[in-house]
Curated annotation (Swiss-Prot):
Keyword Cytoplasm: no
Coiled coil: 67-359
Function: Transcription factor involved in the control of neuronal differentiation in the brain. Regulates dendrite development and branching, and dendritic spine formation in cortical layers II-III. Also involved in the control of synaptogenesis. In addition, it has probably a broad role in mammalian development as a repressor of developmentally regulated gene expression. May act by preventing binding of positively-activing CCAAT factors to promoters. Component of nf-munr repressor; binds to the matrix attachment regions (MARs) (5' and 3') of the immunoglobulin heavy chain enhancer.
Family to which this protein belongs: Belongs to the CUT homeobox family.
Name assigned to this protein: Homeobox protein cut-like 1
SMART domains to which the protein is assigned, alphabetical: CUT, HOX
Amino acid sequence: MAANVGSMFQYWKRFDLQQLQRELDATATVLANRQDESEQSRKRLIEQSREFKKNTPEDLRKQVAPLLKSFQGEIDALSKRSKEAEAAFLTVYKRLIDVPDPVPALDLGQQLEIKVQRLHDIETENQKLRETLEEYNKEFAEVKNQEVTIKALKEKIREYEQTLKSQAETIALEKEQKLQNDFAEKERKLQETQMSTTSKLEEAEHKLQTLQTALEKTRTELFDLKTKYDEETTAKADEIEMIMTDLERANQRAEVAQREAETLREQLSSANHSLQLASQIQKAPDVAIEVLTRSSLEVELAAKEREIAQLVEDVQRLQASLTKLRENSASQISQLEQQLNAKNSTLKQLEEKLKGQADYEDVKKELTTLKSMEFAPSEGAGTQDSTKPLEVLLLEKNRSLQSENATLRISNSDLSGSARRKGRDQPESRRPGPLPASPPPQLPRNTGEQVSNTNGTHHFSPAGLSQDFFSSNLASPSLPLASTGKFALNSLLQRQLMQSFYSKAMQEAGSTSTIFSTGPYSTNSISSPSPLQQSPDVNGMAPSPSQSESAGSISEGEEIDTAEIARQVKEQLIKHNIGQRIFGHYVLGLSQGSVSEILARPKPWNKLTVRGKEPFHKMKQFLSDEQNILALRSIQGRQRGNITTRIRASETGSDEAIKSILEQAKRELQVQKTAEPVQASSTASSGNSDDAIRSILQQARREMEAQQAALDPALKPAPLSQPDLTILNPKLLSASPMSTVSTYPPLAISLKKTPAAPEASTSALPSAPALKKEAQDAPTLDPPGSADATPGVLRPVKNELVRGSTWKDPWWNPVQPERRNLTTSEETKADETNASGKEKTGSSQPRAERSQLQGPSATAEYWKEWPNAESPYSQSSELSLTGASRSETPQNSPLPSSPIVPMAKPAKPSVPPLTPEQYEVYMYQEVDTIELTRQVKEKLAKNGICQRIFGEKVLGLSQGSVSDMLSRPKPWSKLTQKGREPFIRMQLWLNGELGQGVLPVQGQQQGPVLHSVTSLQDPLQQGCVSSESTPKTSASCSPAPESPMSSSESVKSLTELVQQPCPTIETSKEGKPPEPSDPPTSDSQPTTPLPLSGHSALSIQELVAMSPELDTYGITKRVKEVLTDNNLGQRLFGETILGLTQGSVSDLLARPKPWHKLSLKGREPFVRMQLWLNDPNNVEKLMDMKRMEKKAYMKRRHSSVSDSQPCEPPSVGIDYSQGASPQPQHQLKKPRVVLAPEEKEALKRAYQQKPYPSPKTIEELATQLNLKTSTVINWFHNYRSRIRRELFIEEIQAGSQGQAGASDSPSARSSRAAPSSEGDSCDGVEAADTEEPGGNIVATKSQGGPAEVTAAPADREEATQPAEKAKAQPLSSGTPGQDDGEDAGRSRPPPEGLADAPAPVPNLAAPAAGEDAATSATAPAMATEAPGAARAGPAERSSALPSTSAPANAPARRPSSLQSLFGLPEAAGARDNPVRKKKAANLNSIIHRLEKAASREEPIEWEF
């Protein structure tokens, strides 16, 4: 059998039935074509014979007639033979063409044979196994017989065990006794050791207390020493400055005397010359006069020479005293430093002892409180407020000295004014050397303050300038301050940078106007008339062209290697992370594109014009001095706020600075009092005391402005008033030999901290590095009220600063547009409220603003970690205010620095900048960006963090930039310095060094949550649920409220959620619905639905991830049914349940995607819908919400108050949203029209009559129902859309169900149409008719609109087909006009648009096999076909094979029986349906033509 099946299989495989069928098809086609040709040729032959008969003579015809007749008979015989052969071929062809290929069946049969053979083998194997089992049974019986012996052996074993047990018990008793004795001994020893350790502990505690007291004493001694040291250094510095000023004045007097002596000598020579002339004219009478004049001139000259000698002695004496003072101060400084080192060493020892014995933080807090407590009484203050009494005391002490100070200042100005007037008379060529840019009285009092930072920028602080510097500038009427106006900080910085570029060239060119004086003090220099006259660019303009020309003319002759210069500049820019835009703006005065072009493709020197050479001159000057690069780097850091470390301090820094200014002024006055005699009268002193106070207040004001600019640029732009022009004037000198006297900057002295390394203070703003730690600890360590309490004297100064801060600063104006948001009156009010409220809060305003999402301790730790977070771009990124507590938070009060109205848009968040150390770690490594982004994406997905939050909190980028960077990361080598920063931040974030606040944290409870579902709220995901539909406000990322459910309930419901196939939810029945009249807590509280209850184990994202596959179509259908049945709107459902807008909900319900095509974020609304459907009280809660909304609307509608806010009810019911869109309540939303049921019914009836009503019908409906015409129009539009969507979803479902259950039998192969588009199925498009399994035709046709869906589910499976898509399927051959050229037995739908088309004839039974083909072909059922039947739509092309003709049906049934016999799957036969369909169409055409040719009678006889 197997051999027979195998040989059969091989035979049929070789036979290749399909190839044979193809060959038969080709032969049949050839035969059909030949028949047509033979018919034509026969006609031609007959016509030729007729013509031959007509044209030839009769005798010839008689001769040829027998031959022609024999030919005709032969042709007839041949044609008859060919017809019989064709008929025989046709019968064979008909039988063979539909024969299924038996190869698969034979193959299956062969496999079944193999299986049967294997069954036989298994049976024999079974027999063998049975035999072996019997043998084993026998062996088992033998083993049972041996059990008796085993029992005996067990009894013996039991006896042995009992003996062993008794022996073990005796041994155990002995051992127990021994152990008890040992234990008693050990317990005794332990007690002794415990006593000794307690005594030692007491001794250690005693020692610790003594050490702590010693440490405190040493700290206080060290503190006192530092203060003494600071006072002595400042006093010495003041003395040195006084001596220097005296020395310079003496020099000036000496020079004036020399000039007067020269003038006298000239007068003497001229007098001599005139005397000689006069002697010639009249000698005798004028001899006495000449003697007299000569003697008087000589006397005057001698007096002047004596005065010069006296002045020279004074100068020498002053220089000697100066050197002696220097030596004394140096020795004192060295002694103090030795003492300081000794104290530091003892302090280190004590700290090492204390390190292992006490908690560092506690000790630190105690020491800081002790420090603050000891500082107040040491300065003479007794009240709680440590700064205010000190200021008052200092002002009282200084009030008596201010009048003397003013008179001294007037005398100084008189002296310097006379010197200026005399100096003006001299020719400019007589002045020796380049002149300093400031007059001697304006020299700094403290040489420590005149030292510029190592980066080339200067302290932007009036604390470094003497008091008379400001007052002389303010009081001197000769200074042209009024003409300068307001100036840009950019231009000041540009001048500051340009100074070092051009100063050398200026000096070489002999220019007398230096931008900055770079050399040390000159002992013989004469003061310039005015500091502003010496700097031509002081008004904020760039250096004049003459200056740059003079700078360029120096190196005009030399050849410059442009490529090398460009390479060096690029290296320096990359090394210091300086952008080309900044470099071009400040150095070259060009745009970024021009700079990039110059650096990328530098032209050779000889090809450049004069103007083209100028950038290279500037670049060379830029590279010549390291200070230029450092200055530019500080500007870059200030503009970007990234790399340079920022020093932060609270507002107490400004008070400390004012205090130090007043102390310094006091000491200076004392020094001046002792050094110089008082030359002013009492009237002058009384008249000028007010001026002195005003100058001090103005100086304090400038100090505060500088402090604000340095320490809080993100909160308030720092205005620079006109008198501050001189701050950045060429006055602060670089390091000189005299700068070694003091090593402490003044702010560091006042804050009792040693200065840090110079690299730490690269900012150009006035902040010492030592401020950093003090500022960080200030909010937690200072006593309440001490941090921000403003002294009464200084409060008007601060108010004045606030009022003056509305000027448009080009530096900070583009950075902080949102901050200038309050009026001036509000600022002053806020300042007063802050002054009183700060005593309660105990922390500074900027810090309060930043403590939003974290607690106070977390905030302090965060800002300790980021000391440089304050930058021009740092805009307090955590300003997201949450829920009900928003109105009570202190940061909601208007900021004192915001001058206009608060804007609704929140401040753009920024990230804390990176430190240089973090840059250096990764900047020069090779980082694999692809792997890094992969890890970041994994971590984001694992923690459920959306890219928007990650970009805002970690990278400082938008969501689009983050998405682009994560999907297409560039290689590390192709990234610029700025482009590498996000990847460095990603690496730091992965390492846990950055942005730890971004990870999901548990939301904090804000209020009672009434009905909630037990799944977790992830605060970070809140803004990410519907980023397309919800406005991205800060409230969307606020922490979520927690549910008051117990944890056991939560865990229980969570486990149920996980176990159920579709997640269900338990509701908390604890709360009661709130009163509908409750207004929202605050004006700005968003009307967001209540989020899911917080639980630390499971979030909604995890619920989505764990959820099994949901039927999205089924869920949306059920939701729509529930909403429609209960007359609930999609807006209410979306806002309350899904947290989406009405448009998003409508789109979601109309076109739900399959579950497997949705992302995690896209699945979330469906999970929420499923949870809502599983809630038994879902409808009631939504109805409650709807009623409350309606009540609120009615209240608003009937209330006459114009400014009343909409009273939105608090959300009741289960809320499954996290990122709900906050609705701003100050905008009244247009009320939603709710129709009554009877109105809906009337509109539905009108719709059934006319889906597209005319305007007249609409107006009639509106008047009948008492509605607006717009409402009626909208209802018709919405209803049409709804029906269209329902039809669309049902068609999709019917298509999927029909494909799943399709069988291969011809009766079940009804054509399924492709789903139409949304508009096609409704608006006047005919539906294609589909064939039911019974062969009946059900024609569904929508008349001019979407019909009411009232059919049974079986009817709903019928799909619609657009009429415009139906295309004619061309025949294989034959004329297009043939109506009968198709399969005769095939069912056809009526043509479109013909109502009276004949119904198609059901399939007839197949005729007998022996019946003649001609008679079967001429059956009446096959004669005609309805017009248009040749057309087949796209649905037919894509569907299964329709019922074919009767002869083709019989062989088509055989494979189905074979399949049922051998168990082939039904889908196997359906695979080649399209091929079979094409083949059947071709076959029908050919067979019909052959049968027609075979059955045709010869119409014309032969002529012969």
